[in-house]
Amino acid sequence: MQSKKNLLTLHPEKVISKTTIEKHLEYLVMYIEKVNSPQDIKGLNINELNVLADEIRTGVLNRVSNHGGHVGPNLGFTEATVAMHYVFDAPRDKFVFDVSHQVYPHKMLTGRKDGFLKVDDMNAISGYSSPRENSEYDLFEVGHTSTSVALASGLQAARDLLGEKYNIVVVLGDGSLSGGEAFEGLNVAAEAGTNFIVLFNDNGMSIAENHGGMYKSLAALRESNGESSNNIFRALGFDYMYVEAGNNVEKLVEAFRKVKDIDHPIVVHLHTEKGHGYQPAVEDKEAWHWSVPFDLKTGKPKNVDGGESFSDLLGQYLVKKAELDDKLLVVQSAVPAMSGLSKERREALGKHYVDVGIAEEEAVALISGAAKAGAHPVWGTPATFMQRTYDQLCQDLAVNGNPAVINVLGASIYGMNDFTHICFFDIPMFSHIPNLVYLAPTTWEEFIAMEDWAIAQDAYSVALRVPCAVVHSDEEYPTDYSQLNKFHVAHRGSQVAVIAAGGFYQKGEAVLRLLADEGINATLINPRYLTGVDEQLLDELKRDHQLVVTLEDGSLDGGFGERIARYYGPTDMKVLNFGVKKALYDRYDVNDLLRDNHLTETQIVADIKAVLA
């Protein structure tokens, strides 16, 4: 039976019209509103499963258009998710989603549909796999890529050790295969030799286009209907099955039934379409990987910020820099948009551009090698992904002292705020690596001055904490930062010194104004360097200051402020450190976070006055 007024797509080869979604949400009563667990779809026939897939796709579009989120990955894996839950028996069978960019349909089928159908409930549901939502269907908190196979290999080892019987099903995207941990997991799972089903979701895309030699092999498999002898999965020790119609529920159900309860590892290669069912997402797969809230009819953002963005300015800068510097090598790891590198700008960079895929470890080793060979490499990626390559930062780069440049993006409480994507743990990570200089520019102009110096110099590995907000200044900044750890005194006063780092420098200026209203002429310092202290200046402050205040847009534990407090430890100088306390944060409200950590300007001033009293 089909929906009485199902004007949505009833077949996977068709495309949902941009004009139908909102007015047809009211008709989502045939199947999805009655589904509270995968058991509720077991009795449906193929035609009914197709209708269910359409209803799920409509729910996905309802959420992302109102709340923002991952668009293309979820639309492209809708049919496969329906087929998974129809054939396999979760939660007894274990599903592990890589990066979980495609987890929305899964959530709708496992009791969380209200987070997609009802606008008021959307904040309650994470955009990622999350057992914290009290769901037995989500096994792991997942948000970074290439981890699913390794996590699932642990399930495999425990299942086999305990003599249990269930299917382990891994959802792995082709973009995720560019990360080394995916291969480590595949290697281990293949050697175990027991039930281990990898659903390889191949839509020919990462976030942007795929990069790497193995993607030619994957293309050959697609073009030969899986018959190519150049099969990377068989070479790793997996059995293999190819499904060309990766957005066809009937074909997927047929394939999954063949591999259910299999007694050895197998890869089921699904050829899917990223953005399937929503034409704008099909036509521009990169732009629609993730989106802010948008108008379904036009595809345009609902809230347009007409101001400058740091990423756009950075992209312009890098293209212009390549025109002036024949040695410049711009390196990305699958997220070029974060550095303002549109497809047109990537093409303009030409040989100056390298994308290593989702492989941050490779990126750091590559820029170290490139610097050694005389290039001027610059790599940028969000701070949350820097955590994936700490060993390479220490060993391959800093120990060797090669003069590569790293742009640490979004490192701020104003950056990404999902549980798995918190971006303010970078200062403890970078600032304690010997032989690496970590700079904290406060404005766009200061960033350019520091970046130009970092690229031109050949003495240090240099990282820059790129501000989130665009702040302009007519101040003349130094062009040489080789005198390390030399802080800049912007305003000299007495009694209280405020050392405000990076993106919190403007907060420091606001605090100074409030203190002036209280009759306190405080000193304001831009430290510029996060990897050391200006001992001479700190000693000078002891003469006519009784309190030093540090402000940092990051973690207090192991942060910049603790370095200042440690220096003053044996002295009579009082120190107040302001930053974010150690905790697990998830989808926080920035204003709440500021208040909870006493980071509003009025709270800071009140705390300063309390110490001085």
What are these regions (language model features)?
Residues 70-192, 328, 333, 342-343:
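Cofactor-binding active-site loop characterized by glycine-rich and histidine/acidic residues
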Residues 58-65, 124-141, 164-169, 343-354, ...:
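Glycine/charged-rich beta-loop-alpha catalytic/anionic-binding loops adjacent to active sites
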Residues 29-108, 245:
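N-terminal amphipathic, basic-rich helices that act as targeting or association modules
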Residues 138-295, 300-307, 311-316, 436-545:
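Glycine-rich ThDP/TPP pyrophosphate-binding loop and its adjacent helix/strand module
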Residues 93, 278-387, 392-402, 500-502, ...:
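Non-catalytic terminal/interface segments that mediate subunit docking, oligomerization
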Residues 115-125, 191-205, 398-410:
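A glycine-rich helix N-cap at a beta->alpha junction
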Residues 293, 301-304, 415-417, 437, ...:
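Peripheral docking tails and interdomain loops at the edges
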Residues 9, 16-20, 24-27:
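Short, positively charged and aromatic/hydrophobic N-terminal segments
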